[in-house]
């Protein structure tokens, strides 16, 4: 009975700790909120640099969001800004390919260029 209870507790605590470490990536709540705001409205060059720390610790949820943003990057009017995002996205894709497995394949091919 005690053994079952211990395994049950471990089963709850360990996955939660793993997910938390991926989600937080050492960033404060405000930094994470700022990052998501950047993704939602389009990123400036400065915002891309600020988001880089988060991108280095990407997880599947943020990968899916970033892929969707990349696929719709034509909405970014500034071509320099768009290219900076593409380069940063491609770097992130190379560093964490497994995170993007659920993504749109044609878009992934474009991102890898």
Swiss-Prot record:
The protein, known as: Venom protein 184
Broad class of the protein's primary localization: secreted
Entry PTM: Contains 3 disulfide bonds.
This protein's UniProt keywords: Disulfide bond, Secreted, Signal
Tissue expression remark: Expressed by the venom gland.
Protein origin, superkingdom: Eukaryota
Signal peptide (residue range): 1-21
GO annotation, cellular component aspect: extracellular region
Location of the protein in the cell: Secreted
């Amino acid at each position: 009975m005690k053994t079952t209870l211990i395994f049950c507790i471990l089963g709850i605590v360990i996955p939660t700790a793993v997910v938390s470490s991926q989600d937080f990536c050492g960033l404060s709540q405000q930094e994470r909120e700022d990052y998501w705001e950047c993704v939602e409205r389009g990123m400036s060059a400065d915002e891309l640099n600020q988001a880089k720390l988060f991108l280095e610790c990407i997880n599947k949820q943020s990968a899916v969001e970033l892929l969707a943003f990349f696929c719709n990057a034509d909405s970014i009017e500034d071509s320099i800004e768009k290219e900076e995002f593409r380069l940063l996205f491609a770097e992130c894709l190379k560093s964490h390919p497994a995170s993007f497995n659920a993504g749109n394949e044609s878009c992934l091919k474009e991102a890898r260029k």
